[in-house]
Amino acid sequence: MLGSLVLRRKALAPRLLLRLLRSPTLRGHGGASGRNVTTGSLGEPQWLRVATGGRPGTSPALFSGRGAATGGRQGGRFDTKCLAAATWGRLPGPEETLPGQDSWNGVPSRAGLGMCALAAALVVHCYSKSPSNKDAALLEAARANNMQEVSRLLSEGADVNAKHRLGWTALMVAAINRNNSVVQVLLAAGADPNLGDDFSSVYKTAKEQGIHSLEDGGQDGASRHITNQWTSALEFRRWLGLPAGVLITREDDFNNRLNNRASFKGCTALHYAVLADDYRTVKELLDGGANPLQRNEMGHTPLDYAREGEVMKLLRTSEAKYQEKQRKREAEERRRFPLEQRLKEHIIGQESAIATVGAAIRRKENGWYDEEHPLVFLFLGSSGIGKTELAKQTAKYMHKDAKKGFIRLDMSEFQERHEVAKFIGSPPGYVGHEEGGQLTKKLKQCPNAVVLFDEVDKAHPDVLTIMLQLFDEGRLTDGKGKTIDCKDAIFIMTSNVASDEIAQHALQLRQEALEMSRNRIAENLGDVQISDKITISKNFKENVIRPILKAHFRRDEFLGRINEIVYFLPFCHSELIQLVNKELNFWAKRAKQRHNITLLWDREVADVLVDGYNVHYGARSIKHEVERRVVNQLAAAYEQDLLPGGCTLRITVEDSDKQLLKSPELPSPQAEKRLPKLRLEIIDKDSKTRRLDIRAPLHPEKVCNTI
């Protein structure tokens, strides 16, 4: 078994052991005493014997009955010390003695050289059985173009997508070294050709991982001295898989022809195959599913690195085919799962707003839009009603969670005229000229981003002047005079202007619809749904909203560049029930995670909490109502030690107050004290319930301060 293990390592272990045993530096390293502390008279390295568990001058503990883990009662600590010294390249000195022994005289062992080599091979054998070492061996075999070794390691369970500790995979190693046969084996085994490299540059990677960029990391003074005198120490450490310098590791384990100062983060195997200018490997990767449009951290595709020739022609053809397949795949996905349906999963209500935004984006995705002008939206409505969330979900749909695809600017930070410089950058000669503007800098990175100008009504009117060119021609000139083309971007502005008028008009429309349904004497679910669907009239938009917007923004040309003005309406009763249940589910999940408490509630609880809705504050008023009437009780009960771990709680409405919920009329101010109250009940294991007696603290609104 040991022989086969060594042969599998290409006879590296025997050669290395011979170099260790025959090294003149080792035989001469004895200090002032002149004694050969490293080897005995038979050439036996005592430090290697101790590393395997034995004491100097004796048989190894592997065969003596004393375990290598303990090392005996006398030699345990020293054996561990020498084991660390052996693996880290530092040899024990003559001044280091065993407990209970005057000195280490280097008496040779009876076992001799063969026994020592056998023990060292056992150490290597134990190390090679770890799963991580199979992955490391796979990387080595891929670099050496050893197709048989790669196949064997994969059959033994090596991870085909395992990464080197510095970030690359075996497929990347094979691609950069033009090992086409290994690339075929790895792709057949399921290697992902679209994985990105985590290695950036030598110096940046060294800083991130805390390793020296040039020297061997983790050495102390003694081991560095040994490395300078005996070059095999570094080889021995690298053979055992111990940390080495980033530059040495990159050149030895990956490739030594790459620029060490360039950043390779995000590069795929296809990027590396193009850098190697290997036509066969590029074709294999493309046939194996590699994405020719994938960009690295620098924003470059494989085509950007291609030279003139067959590889460039192949990449251009593949890009066109891949784009066509991608368009068909995305179109099929949109048919099966429309944008409106995706948005409704995250936003409650606002069907009219979702339909308006979805229709505009559908025109853009299918090519039915003006390519010379960007899409511009203005979201109007009360606070806490879903305007910002709709913008976020639109960006998530367009850019698949890419952070650069969503740019948010809080326009309350641009209330002064001079703050235009923060928008596009300072002019030459002013502070911050080299840094660039907040908007222009981000649009350079992603010209087709979704840009949110939050609360645009709070910005200075002169700040909005620069948006005229942005919305009309889809370009913007920064403080350095450079033009950023962003015709493919989507610009969304949110505003609370005319929010009161919109809310009152919507409530009036709902009241009229409710009266119509009552006149029909048909209060069923269908009529409720009909009453929920209201539409803002054109007369209201032109005669009420338009004058308010013109008075605030002062420019017709600014309003004329807006493609769609989207109106967000107050929530109806059914939508408020959804908001309450969503908030209660949030606190039920939090109670389970933090306190192992199961939280339940009756259906009437949602009807009670809906009364806390304020049309001016939107969903935030529901959130605050749940915190006041439910979470406050939970916190007080927990503080008073009334909630045992693992219990089940139920939120109920007092029986004497449930009849108030059946009354269709709103309670008068005199009857405010008779509003339903929420109580907490604990459910025992026998399904019996008991009400919690919570000592209510002073209510903040009922505390009187005496002067």
UniProtKB/Swiss-Prot annotation:
Recorded consequence of changing residue 178 to E: Shows higher order assembly but disaggregase activity is severely impaired by 70-80%
Q: Which residues carry this modification: N6-acetyllysine?
A: 589
Q: Where in the cell is it found?
A: Mitochondrion intermembrane space
Enzyme Commission number(s) of this protein? 3.6.1.-
Q: What is the effect of changing residue 431 to G?
A: Decreased ATP hydrolysis activity. Loss of ATP-dependent protein disaggregase activity
Q: One short Pfam family name for this protein? A: AAA_2
Show me the ANK repeat boundaries. 133-162, 166-195, 265-295, 298-327
Q: Which InterPro entries match?
A: AAA+_ATPase, Ankyrin_rpt, Ankyrin_rpt-contain_sf, ATPase_AAA_core, Clp_ATPase_C, ClpA/B, ClpA_ClpB, P-loop_NTPase
Q: Name one GO cellular component term.
A: mitochondrial intermembrane space
Binding-site positions, ATP: 346, 348, 383-388, 455, 496, 561, 620
Q: Which PROSITE patterns match?
A: ANK_REP_REGION, ANK_REPEAT
Q: How is it modified after translation?
A: Proteolytically cleaved by protease PARL. ATP-dependent protein disaggregase activity is stimulated by PARL-mediated cleavage of the N-terminal autoinhibitory peptide.
Predominant subcellular localization, coarse grouping = mitochondrion
GO MF, any single term: ATP hydrolysis activity
Interval spanned by the transit peptide: 1-36
Note the effect listed for residue 387 to A. Answer: Loss of ATP hydrolysis activity. Loss of ATP-dependent protein disaggregase activity
Q: What is the effect of changing residue 427 to L?
A: In MGCA7A; decreased ATP hydrolysis activity; decreased ATP-dependent protein disaggregase activity
Q: Where is this site: Cleavage?
A: 126-127
Q: Where is this region: Regulatory?
A: 507-535
Associated disorder is:
3-methylglutaconic aciduria 7B: An autosomal recessive inborn error of metabolism with a highly variable phenotype. Primary disease symptoms are increased levels of 3-methylglutaconic acid, neurologic deterioration and neutropenia. Other common features include progressive encephalopathy, movement abnormalities, delayed psychomotor development,impaired intellectual development, cataracts, seizures, and recurrent infections. 3-methylglutaconic aciduria 7A: An autosomal dominant inborn error of metabolism with a highly variable phenotype. Primary disease symptoms are increased levels of 3-methylglutaconic acid, neurologic deterioration and neutropenia. Other common features include progressive encephalopathy, movement abnormalities, delayed psychomotor development, impaired intellectual development, cataracts, seizures, and recurrent infections.
Report the domain remarks: The ankyrin-repeat region is necessary for ATP-dependent protein disaggregase activity. It plays an important role in stabilizing the substrate-bound homododecamer by mediating contacts between the two homohexamers.
Q: How is this protein organized at the quaternary level?
A: Homododecamer when substrate-bound; the homododecamer consists of 2 homohexamers stacked head-to-head via ANK repeat-mediated interactions. The active substrate-bound form is likely to exist in a dynamic equilibrium between homohexamers and homododecamers. Homotetradecamer in the unbound state which is remodeled upon substrate binding into the homododecamer. Interacts with PHB and PHB2. Interacts with MAVS; the interaction is enhanced by Sendai virus infection.
Q: Return the similarity comment.
A: Belongs to the ClpA/ClpB family.
Question: What is the official name of this protein in its record?
Answer: Mitochondrial disaggregase
Q: Gene encoding it? A: CLPB
